[in-house]
Amino acid sequence: MWIVAGVCSGVAILLSFYLIYKHLRNYTNPELQKYIVRILIMVPIYSVDSWLSLRFVELSLYFDVVRDTYEAYVLYCFFSLIVAYIERDFDLVELLHSKEPLPHPFPLTCLPKIKLDRGFLTNCKRFVLQFVFIKPIVAIISLVLETQHKYGEGKFQVGTGYVWLTVVENISVGLSLYFLVLYYKAMEEELKPFKPLGKFLCIKSILFFSFWQSIAISFLVYFGVISPIGSWSVDNISSALQDFITCVEMVILAICHHFFFNYQEFRDPHKVPFIYDKTTKTFFNNPKTNITPIIKNFFTNVTNISDVISDTRETFILPLLSPDHHHNHPTTKKKDEESNLLEPEDKDIII
């Protein structure tokens, strides 16, 4: 089984590395492509992690911490990608202020409509970003509980850590996806040229399948469908089964990435690729097409997580230190004053 999984992982990694190379070779829009490359890296990470977990099943929980952490990071990268796409052509806050209040999607249509302003954007960032922290924390707690034999993977019993951590993770990812959908609905018209739906389904599919696969396998364990075989315990078999399925799925996802995250839209004969200068934190045109700038772009721009730190500071730390931070922001203050002057008072539409 692990040999078949290894072949699938190898194919998925080769397909992904080729697409990553092509994006870095045609790095004409760094602000978008850095997020795209980060998303594409998900396939190699998942493939290697799942194969290692399958090959060394006793250590699978340790390997999964890396995979779970990157899974949450990819969701944040997709949100940042569609924000960056809008900011390329519009002042995002001004655009939000020009729109009508947004109704909640079904089945929450009974809730008050959402006023679109900087506060809405901050809330979207906050709820997407919280998953980036909750997911690895849940993974680490799972690891600690497993070492104490209190995790009980696949056991739907109140006394096991598995049940409670699954609930916490489900709530966290649900909120993250919900606010991602809210932003998408608010910007649906402006995002149409970017064709975000296929890209979003690529991201959501891995979150959906990885989570519900584990739940489905846990039910199989609970009802006795999966039983011990030789030296392999039920936990070993259920973990190996999920890792094997993931290795196969990565081939499909890597192929989908070639359609939905294609580099061709960034291939412009009238533009030369950019290269990132870490010292000045700016991009400059790079007339060369050798491997050096490709490596440089990857290690100095794609792997630079300063945007995560900045968003964390903006959405979590500053509001705690200064509750009036949002209202004191110059753009927000100006827009709020304009809204008070130009818009009729309607308390039901603000949340």
Swiss-Prot record:
The gene is tmem184C. The keyword Lyase does not apply. InterPro entries: Ostalpha/TMEM184C (IPR005178). SMART domains: Solute_trans_a (SM01417). Residues 339-351 have a biased composition (Acidic residues). Belongs to the TMEM184 family. It is a multi-pass membrane protein. Pfam families: Solute_trans_a. The chain crosses the membrane at residues 1-21, 39-59, 73-93, 127-147, 162-182, 206-226, 241-261. The keyword Ion transport does not apply. Residues 327-351 are annotated as: Disordered. It is found in: Cell membrane. Glycans are attached at residues 26, 236, 301, 304. Probable transporter. This is Transmembrane protein 184 homolog DDB_G0279555. It comes from the Eukaryota. Signal peptide: none annotated. One of its GO terms (molecular function) is transmembrane transporter activity. Keywords: Cell membrane, Glycoprotein, Membrane, Transmembrane, Transmembrane helix, Transport. GO terms for cellular component: membrane; plasma membrane.
